[in-house]
């Protein structure tokens, strides 16, 4: 999408085509096979990095493509549309890459960004805790000074892909020297650091990327593990959350496209009394409605990414939340309608749609719940009184 039209630039169209052509070599069957064997999608990730797709949004001087969140979300959408959506794309290049590129020191950028860009290094993100989900002000992971070092202690939960990561960006709290009050702070923690451990959470998701509980038991970090200023971490954190929502929306749009593609192919060829079942309005209309909803969500996702890339943080926050909400709802309905349209075949492994039901449902919960988005829109967009 350019500034003057809804037509993507030739460069973006070429990128979309290149990603779609490449990821078709993997597809949903590859993704499901890896998930069911409890294996990582290492080949897919490495090749995405080698081709420049993972780091397309990161600065060129650190090995990235020098583009923006629009381009990275485009990559995410096309991968999801092929049935190979990877949560770590939301985390490593989008959240962490963005925060480090914007607020990291030169040394931090040189150390972490090239690896994130080419896929040789994966960085997880740890914010959620057992008693702190959307209410992130309840985070209890703390960082205290010990000479020039930091000592980190706490627990995190529902952390994606920590077993694939070499480092994790941890959201904790540090003690303000003058007042003793705790304030947010961001730290890069190597996953092989003494005192750092994790255990898997058994989920009903069909995904090669697993979820984990993370334990930080007095993990000692050097002074330069802190990302950004101690007194501005909340701003740094939110700089990574708009990309998170944009990428979540792009993933959901792609999932919706995938499900509709499978369903449409099926109803075009499945015949009852010599007539394709797709000729009946009882099937055609719900699928058409889902297509409309997915396309509308895609437009809002593109708007959010465009606003973000133009530096309109407030406008991007509103649009990113709306995009995430719209895409999650549209994707969930599209997957459900695909299964319904295919009948019993929609629940078989052969057609590969049923496995997406929990993933589509997850999109309505994470990275921010639909209810919290509605709270945000009610308060910020409509100016209604705060409800919590």
Swiss-Prot record:
It is an enzyme of class 1 (oxidoreductase). InterPro entries: Acyl-CoA_dehydrogenase, Acyl-CoA_Oxase/DH_mid-dom, Acyl-CoA_Oxase/DH_mid-dom_sf, AcylCo_DH-like_C, AcylCo_DH/oxidase_C, AcylCoA_DH/ox_N, AcylCoA_DH/ox_N_sf, AcylCoA_DH/oxidase_NM_dom_sf. GO terms for molecular function: acyl-CoA dehydrogenase activity; flavin adenine dinucleotide binding. Its EC number is 1.3.99.-. GO terms for biological process: fatty acid beta-oxidation using acyl-CoA dehydrogenase. Its cofactor is FAD. It catalyses: a 2,3-saturated acyl-CoA + A = a 2,3-dehydroacyl-CoA + AH2. Belongs to the acyl-CoA dehydrogenase family. This is Acyl-CoA dehydrogenase fadE12.
